[in-house]
A protein has these predicted regions:
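Generic structural signal for helix capping and beta-alpha/helix-loop junctions
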Residues: 102, 126, 212, 330-331, ...
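Short gly/ser/thr-rich secondary-structure transition/capping motifs
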Residues: 121, 130-140, 209-213, 274-279, ...
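Short, small-residue-enriched loops and turns at beta-alpha junctions
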Residues: 124-125, 161-163, 358-360, 407
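Structural alpha-helical scaffold elements that stabilize or flank donor/cofactor-binding regions
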Residues: 146-147, 221, 453
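Nucleotide and nucleotide-moiety/phosphate-recognizing core
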Residues: 47-160, 166-205, 369, 378-382, ...
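Small-residue (G/A/S/T)-rich helix-start motifs and N-terminal tracts that mark the onset
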Residues: 1-98, 225-227, 236-403, 407-418, ...
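Internal gly/pro-rich beta-alpha loop/helix module
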Residues: 152-153, 158-267
Length: 469
């Protein structure tokens, strides 16, 4: 990624995410040169909070804001943001979920008139009484939760990218009381910029605390955000499900990172890079030069799958479609895509399994037998006993395996085999290969299980969902 122009750099930053380690490495030279990243981050956060309040018709001077502040730099970002908001008239209470607070941020917040509520009896925060009883600790925790529940805005600055994974202790209890405990958020899908109009609004500082920063997993309590203000570069959890569902609208604050030498961990498919994969037609093209796609899809029970898959194939600029399936599907395909050709023949790519049940009728059995026979040509031998036929498998045309064909997949296949399961289908495929996993496990850690499926089968994995991996 050397030699990025600023336009290209910004394009990458909008469509790609970098690991927490890479972000730290990109921050380092800026910090060494005295760039005030924390002040930049906090100013952006305060600006977003003020805008959200304005959009909801709440004057900053009449607003109640609760900051959930951790001990590290993420808490410092939150404290400096809270300082700016308090300085402009907001009533802000900082709830310390750890034993310490960022020193400079805490001092500035107190000078601005901010209030502080300590939850840990063993805290070591200057000027704040500690050593209170367990009973009082419980009362303070309940008071903090009630304050947050009645606030206009909650600012989540508990951990940021300093902790990846489940929250524990006081932070975990607070998140569990105010948010969700280990499940995917049940939220209405609203157009960008729209709000439910319900308080409190939640602003996450950099990332929502408690989500898997680098893998997007949700394994414990967290507070779903309405807006996440992230700094320097997107983190994987902002793009990967299920954590991506907890981030709300994402605002990226550009720190002018030098991204040369850093490979994105996650990339979003954009119109531009999708277009790069499409072969443009040539003046002298014939239908065979443009390529032929073969489809074994649909069934008597799901004939629509045959029609949809053939119509989709016809939109991809290919030269010809060959379709194989039961009579009811053949009739419907020809009605919808009259240029389709029925029956066997040479193809340059295959799509199989969509709408094919697991042998509910004799026609289904015939289709499954046809698919199984095709898939044998893609089977690789074991690493311990390589076979000359492996070269032939690698030379086979690209193949998409979906739905009813997934259970017919050989043990190991070359990477031009693309499997397209949803969570339940992937769980079944993995279970058949000895993994102890169900659909909910896949939904909670989709990246982990998609990678595991690739490791076990060798196939390219496209795990379908609201966000597809």
């Amino acid at each position: 990624m050397a030699g990025q122009t600023d336009e290209n750099r910004l394009h990458v930053l909008r469509h790609a995410a970098f690991t927490a380690r890479d972000v730290r490495e990109m921050e380092r030279p800026l910090l060494e040169n005295g760039v005030p990243l924390m002040r930049m981050a906090s100013a952006a956060t305060a600006h977003v909070v003020a805008e959200m309040l304005e959009d909801e018709g709440v004057a900053l001077e009449e607003s109640n804001i609760v900051l959930l502040a951790g001990s590290g730099d993420n808490g410092g970002d939150g404290l400096f943001a809270a300082t700016m908001l308090a300085g402009n008239g907001a009533s802000v209470t900082a709830v310390a979920v750890g034993r310490t607070l960022h020193g400079e941020g805490f001092a500035a917040f107190v000078r601005a008139g901010g209030k502080v509520l300590i939850l840990d009896p063993a805290s070591e925060i200057p000027g704040c009484a500690a050593g209170f009883s367990a009973g009082e600790a419980g009362e303070r925790l309940r008071a903090a939760v009630e304050l947050a529940q009645h606030a206009h805005v909650i600012i989540d600055a508990m951990t940021g990218i300093g902790l990846s994974g489940a929250l524990h202790g006081i932070a975990g209890t607070v998140a569990s009381s105010l948010g969700v405990d280990g499940t995917i958020p049940d939220r209405t899908a609203l157009p960008a910029g729209d709000s439910t109009g319900e308080f409190p609004l939640v602003v996450a500082v950099d990332v929502p605390s408690g989500v898997g920063v680098d893998d997007g997993a949700i394994t414990g309590p967290y507070i779903p955000a309405d807006v996440t203000v992230t700094f320097g570069a997107l983190k994987p959890c902002l793009m990967l499900p299920p954590a991506a569902y907890a981030c709300g609208r994402v605002t990226l604050v550009d720190f002018s990172f030098d991204i040369d030498g850093h490979m994105p961990f996650v990339e979003a498919v954009s119109g531009d890079n999708a277009a790069e994969t499409v072969r443009l037609p040539r003046l002298a093209d014939t239908k065979y030069l443009r390529g032929v796609t073969g489809l074994i899809t649909g069934s008597e029970r799901y004939p629509g799958a045959a029609v949809l898959s053939c119509k989709a194939a016809a939109k991809t600029n290919i030269g010809m479609i060959r379709y194989m399936g039961p009579q009811v599907c053949r009739d419907m395909v020809l009605d919808a895509v009259p240029e389709a050709v029925l029956g066997k023949g040479r193809v340059q790519a295959w799509v199989v399994g969509s709408g094919v049940p697991t042998g509910e009728t004799e026609d289904d059995d015939f289709q499954r037998e046809t698919i199984a026979k095709l898939l044998t040509h893609y089977a690789l031998s074991s690493d311990d006993d390589p076979d000359d036929d492996d070269d032939l498998a690698y030379d086979m045309p690209p193949l998409v395996v979906d739905a009813g064909a997934l259970d017919l997949l050989p043990d190991e296949v070359p990477p031009q085999v693309v499997i397209t399961p949803h969570a339940g289908e992937l769980a079944s495929l993995l279970t058949a290969r000895g993994e102890d996993v169900d659909a909910s496990d896949v939904q909670n850690e989709p990246l982990h299980w998609a990678l595991r499926a690739h490791e076990l089968t060798g196939a390219t994995v496209l795990l379908k969902g609201a966000v597809t991996i």
